[in-house]
């Protein structure tokens, strides 16, 4: 089994880039099996800005205060998860 990290930037791809979910579907059809771990950094950043919550980074990692963690959980288990599942289903992948 392969574990694939699908970053938030990959999910926010522009129209002229290949759909990462379509790439995964082709690998699945070729017999590869994998688990997807998703990120959501850009979506988290947007929600933090919307709520006027400051977020800082240290050595490339988000410093996650309790207030920031509440937003992170909300975004990752809400809109991002639903978007990933919907995108997987659209290309025929089980989710």
Predicted regions, residues:
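Nucleotide/pyrophosphate-binding catalytic subdomain
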Residues: 1-95
């Amino acid at each position: 089994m392969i574990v694939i990290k699908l970053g938030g930037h990959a999910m926010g791809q522009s129209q002229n880039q290949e759909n990462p979910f379509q790439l995964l579907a082709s690998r699945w059809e070729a017999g590869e099996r994998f688990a997807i771990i998703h990120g959501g950094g850009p979506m988290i950043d947007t929600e933090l800005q919307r709520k006027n919550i400051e977020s800082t980074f240290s050595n490339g990692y988000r410093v996650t205060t309790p207030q920031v963690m509440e937003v992170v959980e909300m975004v990752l288990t809400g809109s991002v998860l639903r978007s990933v599942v919907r995108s997987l289903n659209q290309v025929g992948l089980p989710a």
